[in-house]
């Protein structure tokens, strides 16, 4: 996240209406939403590195897990951008989603049920108590790189449509 830094014209930037985890991308000439009180600016992650998905190559890649050497350099600035450092992967039951989720439910199982569309299991897993914004930290920290917020939004829309 750029803060107290001059915006360089040569750098390609992404403007986000709202915060980094739950905001929407807007154009540079866009506007701040009615319910938002901040505009986030990140460097665009168009610079793909050879074997960028290997965690030990670059120690400037931010990670909340000790899969890269970036945790050794806590005081040094990290290079935050929009690059995913890999592509979407399969769900792996490591417990990382449960560690960062703010509620006491099973987020991975709920996401899977939203993908399947099983309303009864979605209700048992607590779909009525969540909103897509609750899954923002999962989108950032999950090694599966699955868009959990989008899946939950589609699950809630499906639930609303089927119960009407």
State where each predicted segment sits:
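Redox cofactor-anchoring modules in respiratory/redox and cofactor-processing assemblies
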Residues: 1-164
């Amino acid at each position: 996240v750029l803060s107290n830094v001059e915006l360089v014209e040569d750098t390609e930037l992404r403007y986000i209406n709202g915060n980094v985890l739950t905001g929407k991308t807007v154009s540079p000439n866009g506007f701040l939403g009615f319910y938002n009180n901040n505009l986030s600016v990140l460097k665009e992650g168009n610079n793909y590195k050879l074997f960028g998905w290997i965690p030990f190559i670059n120690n400037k890649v931010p990670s909340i897990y000790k899969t890269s050497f970036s945790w050794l350099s806590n005081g040094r600035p990290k290079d935050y951008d929009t690059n995913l450092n890999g592509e979407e992967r399969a769900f792996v039951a490591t417990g990382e989603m449960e560690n960062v989720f703010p509620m006491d439910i099973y987020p991975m199982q709920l996401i899977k049920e939203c993908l399947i569309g099983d309303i009864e299991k979605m209700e048992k897993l607590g779909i009525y108590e969540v909103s897509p914004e609750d899954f923002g930290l999962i989108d950032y920290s999950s090694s599966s790189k699955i868009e959990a917020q989008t899946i939950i939004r589609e699950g809630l829309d499906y639930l609303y449509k089927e119960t009407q």
